[in-house]
């Protein structure tokens, strides 16, 4: 009987040791290191804008030349591009913009339509604004304008002005780089003159590609304005007849450009 008890005790001790070894030697299911690769991060996926359809230019029933692009889609695209680079959205929903109704705002040279304007701080007039001109029914974008107050033409506001304009263009041409835009902006500014207060300002030159016209308007006492506007052949002809230089295609940072001066075949 004593031998039986000794053998039973030895067996229990062996089982306890074996169980303890198993418990200490391998992590539990709750702490076990993952054996599969982590999910693929979003940054390794194609950018969202690769699935975007090109934006066409159309004319609505009221005869307004516009992009086939709603304000909501513009905001979604703009914020997608901005947040990919800066980690947050820039533009609020349209109902948080200042609504000036139908007109041309106080800006000469702009389109007549339903006017909206936004700044991150509405009381800071040194901050460059972004404006949307929509069709009078408010459902399609006609033009986008970035504006810079001439009284605050210093490095900070000017940089933000150009950056807001860049992302406006990227809504239509997502692959446009900052270096490309700097090349474009330099060429828009070259030999540009400020119109007198009583004159209707005209751009020195217009760059045009796939229905999108981009140009700079300068006038004494007004905001410096970079326009991204829906355009067609009739508008290009009108500009050219007024002496405006039309350049087909946007320049790139490597010095190339699509199209030639005066070539505005659509």
Language-model segments: what does each one mean?
Residues 88-131, 178-219:
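A cross-family detector of function-defining hotspots
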Residues 2-11:
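Bacterial N-terminal signal peptides that target proteins for export
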Residues 167, 171-266:
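Non-cytosolic coordination micro-motifs
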Residues 33-92, 252-254, 259:
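N-terminal low-complexity, Pro/Thr/Ser-rich intrinsically disordered segments
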Residues 25-27:
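Bacterial signal peptide processing site
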Residues 45-59, 121-142:
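Compositionally biased P/S/T/G-rich terminal and signal peptide-adjacent segments
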């Amino acid at each position: 009987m004593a031998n039986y008890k000794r053998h039973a005790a030895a067996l229990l001790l062996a089982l306890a040791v074996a169980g303890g070894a198993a418990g200490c030697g391998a992590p539990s299911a709750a702490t076990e290191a993952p054996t599969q690769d982590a999910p693929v991060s979003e940054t390794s996926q194609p950018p969202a804008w690769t699935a975007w359809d090109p934006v066409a230019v159309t004319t609505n029933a009221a005869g307004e030349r516009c992009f086939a692009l709603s304000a909501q889609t513009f905001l979604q695209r703009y914020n997608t591009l901005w947040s990919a680079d800066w980690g947050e959205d820039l533009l609020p929903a349209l109902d948080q913009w200042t609504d000036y109704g139908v007109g041309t705002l106080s800006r000469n040279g702009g389109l007549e339509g339903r006017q909206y304007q936004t700044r991150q701080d509405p009381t800071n007039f040194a901050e460059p604004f972004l404006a949307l001109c929509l069709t009078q029914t408010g459902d399609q974008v006609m033009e986008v304008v970035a504006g810079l107050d001439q009284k605050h033409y210093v490095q900070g506001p000017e940089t933000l002005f150009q950056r807001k304009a860049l992302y406006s263009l990227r809504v239509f041409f997502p692959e446009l780089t900052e270096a490309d835009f700097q090349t474009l902006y330099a060429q828009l500014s070259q030999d540009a003159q400020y119109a007198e207060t009583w004159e209707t300002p005209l751009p020195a030159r217009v760059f045009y590609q796939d229905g999108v016209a981009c140009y700079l308007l300068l006038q004494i006492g007004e905001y410096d304005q970079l326009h991204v506007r829906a355009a067609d052949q009739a508008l290009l002809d009108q500009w050219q007849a007024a002496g405006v230089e039309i350049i087909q295609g946007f320049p790139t940072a490597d010095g190339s450009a699509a199209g030639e001066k005066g070539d505005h075949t659509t």
